[in-house]
């Protein structure tokens, strides 16, 4: 709250200097998700009051129900469904007043969202599609001395709208979710391969075999003959990749390859700590490079992907940067 109050004082002083009245704005980028509150051009935190309480009881990120809801918003880009919400909330509230149990359950609950079928088939798939299409981004880390580091190429500003598109109307284990998810994947992949960035990287005159080989090279995987032939076969013997639907299917064949998914897991898991909890890129905000990302990826690898033993999720949800969002 101190940072917010300080920001408001600065903003008020600035507006006063120019004799302009500040305005309070509610900004909604997605009508299905919580809105942002701005005082002038300064983003501020709203006071959340629990309905029916008198005197008012304020809701914070320490409240189990609000914390659980936020995992849906940050990782699945949707509000929680009743059954799922009840299940995850119970994982925390079943601890009663045992603070140590609550702390562990919050970590386990939050980490489970990355590992969930819904996220693996939406957000994580989007990350792998960017990887298959554009490879890595070369950045810098100072961990153990300054050195280059290859990191996921997708940026937060790209990730957010793409996840909303591919996950639209999907709630695992509800209704015809599998058919809806597949329809979303088809629609998203076809739109993705028609973007100018993609068609510039892969002209439609490219031969299917060359196209598929480039995609597998980007992900750093040598495919089996079967996997390679399956992806090439999407073009049904055509001489080029002008068929949009076939391009989309071939890209998915590579991005959904089991080896690719396994190899990219830890890198994506660390990336999602920044995208999900901090709502920014790893080299944004208080970070000017990928040193923090490098630190957590190194630690997660040391613990063979065990985020609990690596204390990665714990560190992010207990960080002042995360908590100050609320």
Can you annotate each of these PLM segments?
Residues 1-21:
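Sec-dependent, cleavable N-terminal signal peptides
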Residues 18-326:
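Composition-driven recognition of low-complexity segments enriched
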């Amino acid at each position: 709250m101190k940072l917010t109050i300080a920001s408001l004082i600065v903003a008020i002083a600035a507006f006063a200097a120019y004799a302009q009245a500040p305005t309070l704005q509610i900004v909604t980028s997605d009508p299905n998700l919580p809105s942002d509150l701005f005082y002038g051009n300064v983003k501020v935190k709203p006071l959340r009051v629990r309905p029916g309480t008198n005197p008012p009881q304020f809701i914070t990120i320490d409240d189990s129900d609000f914390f659980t809801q936020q995992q849906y918003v940050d990782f699945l880009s949707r509000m929680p469904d009743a059954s799922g919400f009840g299940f995850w909330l119970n994982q925390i509230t079943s601890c009663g007043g045992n603070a140590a149990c609550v702390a562990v359950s919050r970590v386990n609950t939050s980490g489970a969202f990355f590992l969930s079928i819904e996220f693996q088939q939406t957000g994580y798939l989007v990350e792998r599609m960017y990887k298959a299409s554009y490879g890595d981004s070369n950045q810098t880390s100072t961990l153990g001395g300054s050195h280059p580091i290859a990191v996921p190429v997708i940026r937060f500003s790209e990730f957010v709208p793409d996840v909303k598109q591919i996950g639209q109307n999907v709630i695992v284990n509800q209704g015809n979710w599998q058919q809806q998810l597949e329809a979303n994947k088809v629609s998203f992949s076809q739109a993705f391969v028609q973007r100018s960035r993609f068609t510039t990287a892969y002209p439609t005159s490219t031969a299917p075999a060359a196209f598929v080989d480039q995609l597998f090279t980007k992900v750093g995987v040598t495919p089996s003959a079967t996997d390679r032939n399956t992806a090439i076969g999407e073009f049904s013997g055509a001489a080029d990749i002008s068929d949009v639907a076939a391009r989309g299917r071939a890209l998915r064949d590579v991005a959904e390859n089991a080896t690719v998914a396994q190899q990219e897991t830890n890198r994506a898991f660390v990336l999602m700590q920044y995208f999900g909890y901090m709502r920014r890129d790893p080299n944004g905000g208080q970070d000017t490079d990928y040193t923090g990302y490098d630190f957590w990826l190194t630690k997660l690898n040391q613990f063979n992907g065990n985020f609990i033993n690596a204390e990665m999720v714990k560190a992010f949800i207990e960080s002042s940067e995360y908590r100050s969002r609320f």
